Amino acid sequence: MTQFPSYASSFRLYKSVSEQYNDRSILDSVKRLVPEKVLQLIADDQNLKPLLHWFKNDFMKWMPKELQCKRCNNRPMSIQLVDANTGALRKTEIHVCNVCGSEQIFQRYDNILRIAETRVGRCSEWSILFGAITNSLPIQTRIVHDYLDHCWNESLINNKWVHIDSTLDYPISFDHPYYYEQNWGKNYEYVLAFSANSVEDVTTRYTQQWYLVQKRRGRKDKMKELREIYYRT
């Protein structure tokens, strides 16, 4: 299992994000980003297809993990990580070309309004901002992390937590919880969902191989320890 210090770092992030999800001024600001025609389409039946399409295809831009040099087209570039953990900035990625030495900088934020301003990121930025937008509708939404390499959202629709992944194409982006295990070969140990006051083990929702998850976990369930870390963070 991943060592607990790495969990603590992500817990700080998701607790901050969950608190922002309860900030009315932030939610009002991100709701104004959504075109009125999209809002009208989802208003009556909580159909998120128009919102997912707009967010992925018209609003956000994906940041690849490996960048190509804009000067000489060399790929891949070397990456230097600079931790910030101050204010809205989490860390800075400095991508340096091994051929010509030019640099590209990608700053990673935990501040919802800053992400909305830059409109670029990977799964964490996408899920953080998309969750804020759905909460503004208001459709209660939270962050989910698999502690492998991906995170997404869950929205409470018809009294059921539904898998939502704004980085994927519809219909896979909506209510396809087994997609990652079936198509990406995910070997889960803990999949956690976050709110401002709690962390929940939702692994069973995303696996059809629970016996293998239990084998990876071993005899001791570590959720009690993880909750204690979350509340202390």
Regions found by a protein language model. Give the residues of each.
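Alpha-helical and coiled-coil interaction segments, frequently adjacent to or embedded
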Residues: 1-118, 122-125, 145, 158-233
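Hydrophobic/aromatic-lined pockets within catalytic cores
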Residues: 56, 60, 134-139
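Short, well-structured beta-strand/strand-turn elements
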Residues: 135-149
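A short beta-strand motif that forms the metal-chelation/ATP-contact edge
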Residues: 152-157
